């Protein structure tokens, strides 16, 4: 049986809850990610910031505020004020099917993977898409082998 550990990303980018919205914005843009786990000083998982959360906390483009002023505003907002703390989580041993069901119902697009209170990985919808592609490749290869065997 596949578990969350088999598919999760362990090479994580995370910020601390006292980092700023500006740091989160820059990190998400540079790393091209949509989900940013947030940890405390001890490395314990405390929340999640999504791209949608970032947009909700951002200054509207309709406001006539220059870029530097916007960045100054973002630099004064700690992540603990805008992050989601009521986030569904998974353990590394959670069956992958259950993790998929949680992703579908929670609609966050990711599941932080926590063990002993510490963030150890993240499971995203993209991970499941990659798995689906691998399974389709394996199925197609199997079908080609069956066809070749039938022709002999």
Task: Label the predicted regions.
Residues 15-32, 38-39, 89-107, 114, ...:
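The conserved cystathionine-beta-synthase
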Residues 19-65:
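Acidic (E/D-rich), amphipathic helical modules within compact regulatory domains
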